[in-house]
């Protein structure tokens, strides 16, 4: 027999919705599925659920974002916590878009005020394909620049990108501020078509899939019977695409120039720059990220000097110790997300000339 459930969480800052699920085989007391969203990192919810289930056997498949074993005695189980209905947005004075990794949800949960907030984060689509590439500056740029038919052509030769990567409201004239994180742009692998200069994105920037020396690593997670056909696909990909760089500094600056030129003049563009303080906490693909952040950030700062409607937010300034990192250089403690939100509030209010945003009251 099986016990299965999904988990809903909320705290004094807001509701996190469905943030995890499990499937417990009660006969052999084994967790067959146990998965949680990065929205609730550092809250101890996975530890609490694991303890509540009396710590059954679990086969942990690495890499993971956290390890089980904490106490989480600050969490309370209730039987009346329901999914909140989606509220119809009220007319607000300003409109804001957050675009980047999904842990930005942790920032938004601290923000309130006279605003409507839209988000464009990675997500699993209906075909259970992870839609992530759209957060890269190159995808933002080409989605606006290229006609729809050309974008759809990009989806036909290889398993990536999926058509959903090109769905966006980024260039809508309604936004008064756009918060764009450059963290995914820094660590994701970008490739340029040798003929028409279009872009596709795949994997991590530290593993160039046009380099045959990396193919065994790229194919390591694929069942043996499918490896040869995928190796042939990589050969075709190598003939058609070249690696953009790690990080692709000149290309990112070109993307940002296009983005700023094609946004409404009133839209304040706030760029999130990754932390330059090293940490020993590193998931696969995130190695040496501090050095990469230093390289890209230096050029972005110079680029921004030419504009009065672009602001940078330096995550480096928010880090006080290694405890502020959770699992890697791009995920943070609750204290950092709170400080992150305060920085956003200050920048938006200062640039728009009025205190539209505020920190949520406890």
Where are the predicted features?
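Acidic carboxylate-rich catalytic motifs and surrounding loops in phosphoryl-/glycosyl-chemistry enzymes
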Residues: 273-275, 309-326, 359-361
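Surface-exposed cleft-lining segments at the edges of enzyme active sites
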Residues: 149-155, 190, 203-254, 281-289, ...
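Catalytic nucleophile-elbow at a beta strand-turn-alpha helix junction centered on a G-D-S/GDSL motif
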Residues: 93-140, 178, 183-184
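Histidine-centered active-site loop/cap adjacent to the catalytic His
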Residues: 324-362
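Substrate-gating cap/lid alpha-helix
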Residues: 276-315
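Acyl-donor binding region in acyl/amide transferases
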Residues: 9-12, 18-82
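Short loop/turn segments at strand-loop or loop-helix junctions that form parts
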Residues: 100-101, 175-196, 270-277, 314-318
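Well-ordered, non-membrane alpha-helical segments in soluble/globular domains
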Residues: 51, 159-164, 242-259, 286-301, ...
